[in-house]
């Protein structure tokens, strides 16, 4: 449109935007907002690990792109939701952040069974959080689905000078667990955070049958019902053990 003509219309008195304006006549010129496309899938991911390893920081960096230097420890469970698009599908990702203290294990264990992906986090500057990994693997073996994708994350890479656990140690631990991936990250510096979640979701989608991925009306499609805030029933222990 000619800028001069636009200014002339604004300056004109008594009817520059009157009923005769072609842009507004009958409301035909208004562009209707298209409703957002609903998600094709809803996936649940849980983040586990010892207290203070940065589970909440990783979740909030991914969902809100924020970082809290002095976050309070999670009590029980917390969750956030983020929608991502991968492989031509819109995925509503429900991320559960679990408490690291043992006294909350009876609560948090109820969330394992419904999780399609599990992120196990330790702090590279605290050896005791790495030494706790076998304990967390027992929780996974006891309550999680055998199909759940596993990802081991060494967090706080921004504190490299205080490192107590080498990258090689993290890689070696992950290699002992069937199907477990490994990476290091920093929630503070926003390093590898998006990659953690997106790679995990991509691995989950890879394992889905092709007929489900192609059929948007499948049972895996996101329900528009309100999200449940009550944990599922505690599943029975399963005998299978992942560790080699």
UniProtKB/Swiss-Prot annotation:
Residues 1-37, 225-244 are annotated as: Disordered. Mg(2+) binds at residues 56, 74, 97. Its EC number is 3.6.5.2. GO terms for biological process: autophagy; endocytic recycling; endosome to lysosome transport; exocytosis; protein catabolic process; protein transport; Rab protein signal transduction. Changing residue 106 to A: Loss of phosphorylation. No effect on GDI1 and GDI2 binding. Regulated by guanine nucleotide exchange factors (GEFs) including DENND3 which promote the exchange of bound GDP for free GTP. Regulated by GTPase activating proteins (GAPs) which increase the GTP hydrolysis activity. Inhibited by GDP dissociation inhibitors (GDIs). Residues 1-10 have a biased composition (Low complexity). Its cofactor is Mg(2+). GO terms for cellular component: autophagosome; cytosol; endosome; Golgi membrane; lysosomal membrane; lysosome; plasma membrane; recycling endosome membrane. Its main location: membrane. Residues 228-238 have a biased composition (Pro residues). The keyword Lipoprotein applies. GDP binds at residues 52, 54-57, 155-156, 158-159, 187-188. Transmembrane segments: none annotated. It catalyses: GTP + H2O = GDP + phosphate + H(+). The keyword DNA-binding does not apply. Belongs to the small GTPase superfamily. Rab family. Switch 1, switch 2 and the interswitch regions are characteristic of Rab GTPases and mediate the interactions with Rab downstream effectors. The switch regions undergo conformational changes upon nucleotide binding which drives interaction with specific sets of effector proteins, with most effectors only binding to GTP-bound Rab. This is Ras-related protein Rab-12. It comes from Homo sapiens. The gene is RAB12.
């Amino acid at each position: 449109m000619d800028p001069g003509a636009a200014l002339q219309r604004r300056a004109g008195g008594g009817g520059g935007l009157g009923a005769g304006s072609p842009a507004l006549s009958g409301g035909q010129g208004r562009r209707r907002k298209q409703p957002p496309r609903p998600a094709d899938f809803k996936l649940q991911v849980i983040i586990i690990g010892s207290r203070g390893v940065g589970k909440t920081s990783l979740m909030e960096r991914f969902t809100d792109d924020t970082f809290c230097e002095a976050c309070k420890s999670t009590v029980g469970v917390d969750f956030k939701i983020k929608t991502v698009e991968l492989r031509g599908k819109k995925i509503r990702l429900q991320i559960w952040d679990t408490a690291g203290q043992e006294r909350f294990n009876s609560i948090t264990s109820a969330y394992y069974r419904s999780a399609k992906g599990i992120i196990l986090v330790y702090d590279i500057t605290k050896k005791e959080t790495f030494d706790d990994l076998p304990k967390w693997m027992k929780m996974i073996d006891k309550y999680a689905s055998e199909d759940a994708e596993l990802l081991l994350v060494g967090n706080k890479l921004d504190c490299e000078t205080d490192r107590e656990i080498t990258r090689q140690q993290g890689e070696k631990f992950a290699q002992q667990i069937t199907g477990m991936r490994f990476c290091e990250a920093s929630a503070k510096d926003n390093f590898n955070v998006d990659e953690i979640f997106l790679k995990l979701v991509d691995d989950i989608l890879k394992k889905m049958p092709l007929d489900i991925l192609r059929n948007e009306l499948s049972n895996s499609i996101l329900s528009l019902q309100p999200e449940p805030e009550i944990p599922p029933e505690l599943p029975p222990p399963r005998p299978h053990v992942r560790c080699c």
